[in-house]
Amino acid sequence: MNVYLVGGAVRDSLLGLPVTEKDWVVVGATPKEMEANGFRPVGKDFPVFLHPKTQEEYALARTERKSGHGYGGFTFHAASTVSLEEDLIRRDLTINAMAQARGGEIIDPFNGRVDLKARLLRHVSPAFAEDPLRVLRVARFAARYHWLGFQVADDTLMLMKQLSDSGELGYLVAERVWKETSRALMERDPQVFFQVLHRCGALHALFPELAALDGVPQPEQHHPEVDTLLHQFLCLKQAARLGLSLNARYALLCHDLGKGKTPKEEWPRHIAHEIRSARLSKKVSKRLKVPKEAATLATLVAEFHTHSHRALELKPATVWKLFKSLDILRRPERLTDFLGACEADARGRTSFENREYPQASYLQGAADAARQVDIQALQAQGHEGPALGEAIEQARIDAIATFKQQELNP
């Protein structure tokens, strides 16, 4: 029995990055031998075990063969006779197909170290094209390591294009697409994930509403970058810069989808794009089975982001209607996410990257003022039933009005 550290731990160690997770491959062992040594079996499709002390995953070396469509369309074969190289060749990228022996020796049959040095994301073998999920994985790695200068190798991008054109991406289940997308959204350069998907044709297959924004112009006065898809990419870059939550980043992804439905004769203006964007965001969220709160925020940001941009112009009653839509009294964190997404939208424009966004602090302050209304005092004045509700609402609007006056006339 020989045990090797494999995959991401080896890759990140060679890059000088922190290793957060360790995966191991065991060559020359059987499931019975693993269990006899105290390992607990957890794999459903192939033999994977948890170490009795560290709880790290140990998988028996295995091969795989294409037997159907999609990510799950593979037959696996694990046996004590499977070699380390046979196990490594089934992996997606050369930089993920390295192993480290107990003594520290690096086993690198597919020149992963060469590609690490060249900053290339390159497929291990033509079998790469058998698994459509790898299109998303490569795009995610491109987003993760963009800051180090990594690029997708030309021949790998060609295989990704073939996969996108083949229709195989259509067999990916929604949960897998969302899992890869949500992970990519939280990377250091999330926009790169979608740029790579766009380059290989996968954006049109998986996110047609986003792909439809390519070439759609916006008013240059407000959007010096003009192109709406480029604006989306710039927004995601700002989202990472601002350290926004996953929910806020997903909301940004959906906030301008309605511009793809604007009649060409109306370009570059996009009247009522907010309503169209909200409708499309619901469609995307349903298709990808996006978690409820992320989906809700996406719809709200799509519908109300221009309210945030015009916050200082809005009447106090309109601001309170916005707050009610956001349900700020019960979900204060939603306002934080909403404003973060709106700020990234405002900054996600060529030459606007470092602009201040006073609307965020103004709306937070207005929300605080509305929350501080003394309901007991209103009850003491004799308000009750529906009249109490009306009095509370008017008091919140008045509190926002007072705050606005203080902000505009300090």
Swiss-Prot record:
CDD domains: HDc, NT_ClassII-CCAase. Keywords: ATP-binding, Hydrolase, Magnesium, Metal-binding, Multifunctional enzyme, Nickel, Nucleotide-binding, Nucleotidyltransferase, RNA repair, RNA-binding, Transferase, tRNA processing. Gene3D superfamilies: Beta Polymerase, domain 2, cca-adding enzyme, domain 2. CTP binds at residues 8, 11, 91, 137, 140. It catalyses: a tRNA precursor + 2 CTP + ATP = a tRNA with a 3' CCA end + 3 diphosphate; a tRNA with a 3' CCA end + 2 CTP + ATP = a tRNA with a 3' CCACCA end + 3 diphosphate. It comes from the Bacteria. The keyword Glycoprotein does not apply. ATP binds at residues 8, 11, 91, 137, 140. GO terms for biological process: RNA repair; tRNA 3'-terminal CCA addition. Its EC number is 2.7.7.72, 3.1.3.-, 3.1.4.-. Mg(2+) binds at residues 21, 23. Magnesium is required for nucleotidyltransferase activity. Nickel for phosphatase activity. Residues 228-329 form the HD domain. Its cofactor is Mg(2+); Ni(2+). Monomer. Can also form homodimers and oligomers. Catalyzes the addition and repair of the essential 3'-terminal CCA sequence in tRNAs without using a nucleic acid template. Adds these three nucleotides in the order of C, C, and A to the tRNA nucleotide-73, using CTP and ATP as substrates and producing inorganic pyrophosphate. tRNA 3'-terminal CCA addition is required both for tRNA processing and repair. Also involved in tRNA surveillance by mediating tandem CCA addition to generate a CCACCA at the 3' terminus of unstable tRNAs. While stable tRNAs receive only 3'-terminal CCA, unstable tRNAs are marked with CCACCA and rapidly degraded. A single active site specifically recognizes both ATP and CTP and is responsible for their addition. This is Multifunctional CCA protein. It comes from Alcanivorax borkumensis (strain ATCC 700651 / DSM 11573 / NCIMB 13689 / SK2). The gene is cca.
